[in-house]
Amino acid sequence: MANQVKKYGFVIDPRRCIDCRACLVACRAENNVPLNNTRIWVYDQGIQGAFPNLSQQFVPYNCMHCDEPPCVEACPSQATYKRPEDGLVVIDQQACIGCGLCLPACPYHVRYLNPDTGKADKCNACLQRVEQGEAPACVATCVGGSRLFGDLNDPNSEVYTALREAKSVKRLPAVGVDTGPNFYYINDPVDEKRLAITAPQLPPADAFYKYIVVPGVLLAAGATLVGQAVAFARQLVKGESEYDE
């Protein structure tokens, strides 16, 4: 058990969500999320039931950190990857080329192109906090205890206990494919039809050629032309100097 690899995931209890949106504010502040964009959501499922047995459900929502993430398959530069040490799906901002192919590949629609950087962005579970032993900002700020985060493989973790003791457990499947989301809803059924989850839209087979090979060839060709131009200019200068003598 001591050598077991960590598997981080989220456990959500919608019954405890009061729609205060403190998690959204904390996420934005922690990760410098641009205005008009967000890494996490709280969806209002509306009034349910019939009078006098009425209820209202709020559903916290963000990246599922899937076991089989289509976004990883879609990324031509391998900027999006699943960390082998803990299972979190993250984006290497240095490697991202901003092609946007990962956006439609995500069936949960949790990605966006950051207008400030031109790169893909999404929830990374506040990796900078997790690596310091702290919970993601949204979890640490959740006043109702609706959002939980931890090692799903650790029997002593809060998420493991919550799943074991839950009255019901549900994950949100993508359409037509099992992505293996590490994002669990407990104790209160969630209607995924209201969340607009779709099938992943993977890029065409020539995406790598179009976004990686061709730009690389053009860059190399451009460098070659510049080199030839510099050499030609030097020859002209040399010729003029010899002529002056």
Question: Which residues make up each language-model segment?
Answer:
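Non-ligating segments of multi-cofactor redox enzymes
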Residues: M1-E245
